UniProtKB/Swiss-Prot annotation:
Membrane topology, Virion surface segments: 15-707
Name of the molecule in the record: Envelope glycoprotein H
Family of this protein: Belongs to the herpesviridae glycoprotein H family.
PTM comment text: N-glycosylated, O-glycosylated, and sialylated.
Keyword rRNA-binding included in the entry's annotation: no
InterPro entries: Herpes_gH, Herpes_glycoH_C, Herpes_glycoH_C_sf
Taxonomy of the source species: Viruses, Duplodnaviria, Heunggongvirae, Peploviricota, Herviviricetes
A GO cellular component entry from the record: host cell endosome membrane
Native source organism of the sequence: Alcelaphine herpesvirus 1 (strain C500) (AlHV-1)
The keyword Membrane is assigned to this record: yes
Single GO biological process annotation from the record: symbiont entry into host cell
Gene field: gH
Record note on quaternary structure: Interacts with glycoprotein L (gL); this interaction is necessary for the correct processing and cell surface expression of gH. The heterodimer gH/gL seems to interact with gB trimers during fusion.
Compartment list: Virion membrane; Host cell membrane; Host endosome membrane
């Protein structure tokens, strides 16, 4: 409290020292009649007189040193510029743009929910070993953790929050640091997030001599940083509520420039966006914003405008909003079931920002304790053979997100993902559509896979094969058409419900021409909607990180021409690389015999021996199976794949035969997969032992039926003609 009094009393000069190196004179500085006077006293006291007569305060430095370290006092003294002339101080801050009496007061939703203190029977310490025994088998997360321990790990690094010459007092705090440089340094952002507030410094470099700069601060109204000179936070306050406040520090010249090019027209909307949503809500809003950046090509070519600035400030504010969970004088126990979903949504948002803006740098917001605790929870989860998960799907995937592959030697994470995908895929193959709930679950699966570091032993196991057989199968021609329609409509989008399995498949044959063909089949779309949808899907599917799925395959080092690859079908022992030219070592088959417009080959690659193989010099013909009988008794084709492709359009859809029901539905007389009315569509059967066939039996039967009908028609016409000739002959004989 004494420290706060000290700062408030000294105001512009913030004099805080046990005994200045030289006693300050009591004579007012030249040209100033009301300068604060510093009266020399004993070495343990400092007397400040504000008007020379009536108002003075005596500060006991001995008592202050009990609460404030000596080096901090000295730093504040040096930062206050006590001995510089008032003219210098005035000139230093005279150009600051002031919003005196213009701060907008808003009413927020009230105090948003934070994780309340709990008293769990099992509390986990991050400073000790964490195992399945430590958590007493509570894989549902019914555990307590220390808010201080988690906060100390997330906000671990200590840094100076503001530049030395900034109008805010320099202060060192535990922070999360974030920076982004764009256009070769023409645009620079540096953000610091603490548990009390967040600051964002924005720099626009026009030339070597012309630079514009602004500092935005948002946070707890009572804990905002102090200011130097004659400036107060009331001079630079834009928006405030009972609990929080938004400040903008910039010069008049820079304010004029940024108001035209960068600053939002309505700062109240920015304030409300951050303050009126919980961590989870704000994180999901920002996730959708990042997807919008990606679909519009704004990740590769950033538009440095008000929308971008608002989004970036809100992303930084997520750190601060998470930090409020850990601010308390006394250590308290919080529920893991409450805090983990918040951490998950926030971290997913941060990951998406990093993937969008690849030059983004962040330091901090990592918790080894959460990672180890999540691994212990995963290890305790019971998995029954051929059964689904024993815990809620979202909880499993949120927990798995924080588990490194090195902490999951039994591959329970990948096993669980296959169970989830098996369930979704079973519903999908009925009519080749996905529900919004299924898409959200796939989004969670995607995040768990993206952040997971695979052990080398997991790269060729059956779970990886199953995962990508499922996801690639769900990336069908119908799915591509759905995505084009979804993004073509100017409606409210959602990162969770707009997710497509194509974003985590092993299919890479996307071109603007192909997407236009798929989208053109939807007669409901206008030309503008078609163009918007195709552009969005193409941007999302061809992002820089779109080929990340190949990283988990054991044959990745053996693919020597990735740009040729159209699709990969992974099985446990072999993989099929479908490409426009030979792209991997193995046995290669030519698909050109089926009159495909563009060349396409299929290479059968051994997962374990591809390092020792060379590219095939001989390209074989694909064997053909005529009149293939429908499998009836058992699942003869389980763990095989059927692929359809068009002579003009190329690959269309892949179907993984996961069980007997899928097999029977696929080959039934009512199957919607086989198009009996299109003579230009062909089908390949790829088996898990490296054997492949082209299925032509359906076409042979269909062609024979047509020929028979034609023969009967010709015979009937010939009979009619003969009868006609006989009648005419008898009539005129």
């Amino acid at each position: 409290m004494l420290f706060l009094i000290l700062l408030c009393v000294t105001g512009a000069q913030a004099i805080t020292t046990p005994a200045p190196p030289r006693p300050a004179t009591t004579t007012p500085r030249r040209g100033v009649t009301s300068a604060p006077l510093i009266v020399p006293a004993s070495s343990s006291e400092l007397i400040v007189t504000l008007d020379g007569t009536f108002h003075s305060v005596t500060i006991d430095m001995t008592e202050i040193r009990q609460y404030v370290r000596q080096e901090i006092i000295e730093a504040l003294w040096n930062a206050s510029h006590v001995f510089e002339s008032l003219e210098t101080t005035y000139n230093r801050y005279k150009d600051v743009y002031r919003f005196t009496d213009q701060s907008i007061r808003v009413n927020t939703r009230g105090k948003l929910s934070t994780c309340k203190e709990v008293n769990k029977s099992t509390e986990v310490s991050f400073y000790k070993s964490i195992t399945s025994q430590t958590i007493n088998g509570k894989y549902d997360g019914d555990l307590g953790i220390s808010n201080h321990q988690l906060g100390q790990q997330l906000f671990f690094y200590v840094m100076n929050v503001f530049p030395v010459e900034n109008a805010f007092y320099p202060v060192r705090k535990h922070v999360v640091y974030s920076s982004l440089s764009l256009a070769d340094g023409a645009y620079q952002l540096a953000g610091m997030a603490t548990t009390n507030y967040v600051s964002l410094v924005v720099v626009r470099k026009i030339s070597s001599t012309v630079t514009h700069e602004a500092t935005i601060v948002f946070g707890n109204k009572k804990l905002l940083p102090s200011m130097r000179g004659s400036i107060t936070k009331y001079d630079i306050s834009l928006v405030n509520s009972d609990a929080e406040e938004l400040l903008l520090l910039t010069s008049q010249k820079d304010y004029e420039y940024f108001s035209k090019n960068l600053f939002p027209q309505n700062w109240t909307d920015v304030f409300s966006l951050i303050t009126s949503h919980t961590v989870g809500e704000l994180a999901q809003i920002l996730q959708t914003s990042v997807v919008d950046f990606a679909r519009k090509g704004r990740c590769r070519s950033v538009h440095f405008n008000s929308h971008f600035l608002t989004t970036y400030l809100a992303v930084l504010s997520l750190y601060y909003k998470m930090g409020t969970e850990f601010v308390s004088k006394n250590e308290r126990q919080i529920s893991l079931q409450c805090i983990l979903p918040k951490l998950y949504e926030a971290n997913v948002c941060f990951d998406m920002v990093h993937r969008c803006f690849t030059s983004q740098y962040t330091r901090g917001f990592d918790s080894d304790g959460i990672n180890r605790l999540s691994a212990a929870i995963l290890g305790s989860m019971p998995f029954e053979p051929n059964q689904g998960l024993s815990v809620p799907t979202n909880w499993f995937l949120q927990t798995l997100y924080f588990v490194d592959g090195n902490l999951d030697p039994q591959n329970k994470g990948l096993h669980g993902i296959t169970l989830i995908l098996m369930d979704i895929y079973g519903r999908y193959v009925v009519n080749f559509t996905l529900t919004p709930e299924d898409r959200e679950t796939l989004f969670y699966v995607y995040n768990a896979l993206r952040g997971r570091k695979h052990l080398s032993t997991t790269m060729k196991n059956k779970y990886v094969s199953l995962i990508y057989c499922y996801t690639t199968s769900m990336c069908s021609a119908t799915e591509l058409a759905w995505g084009i329609e979804y993004w073509g409509e100017e409606s409210t989008h959602s990162a969770h419900h707009s997710f497509s399995p194509c974003f985590m498949s092993l299919r890479f044959d996307y071109t603007l021409e192909k997407l236009n063909i798929e989208g053109s089949q939807d007669v409901k779309l206008t030309q503008t909607q078609l163009s918007n949808g195709v552009s969005a899907m193409y941007s999302l599917l061809t992002a820089k990180s779109s080929t990340w799925t190949i990283d988990s395959l054991s044959i990745k080092p053996c693919i020597y021409n990735a740009s040729f690859v159209k699709m990969i079908v992974p099985f446990t022992n072999v993989s099929y690389v479908i490409s426009q030219g030979v792209a991997a070592p193995g046995t290669t088959y030519d698909v050109a015999e089926t009159f495909l417009k563009s060349s396409m080959v299929i290479t059968v690659v051994s997962n374990s021996e591809c390092y020792n193989l060379t590219a095939s010099k001989e390209i074989l013909k694909i064997p053909v199976v005529y009149n293939m009988t429908h499998p009836r008794i058992k699942c003869q084709l389980c763990d095989s794949v059927v692929i359809s492709y068009d002579e003009y359009d190329g690959l269309q859809t892949m179907v993984y035969i996961s069980n007997y029901k899928v097999q029977q539905d696929l080959f039934s007389d009512y199957s919607i997969f086989f198009d009996f009315n299109n003579m230009h569509t062909h089908y390949l059967l790829l088996m898990n032992n490296g054997t492949l066939f082209e299925i032509r039996g359906l076409y042979a039967n269909r062609a024979m039926n047509i020929i028979i009908i034609l023969l009967f028609t010709i015979a009937a016409l010939a009979g009619v003609f003969i009868v006609y000739k006989i009648v005419m002959y008898m009539t005129f004989k």
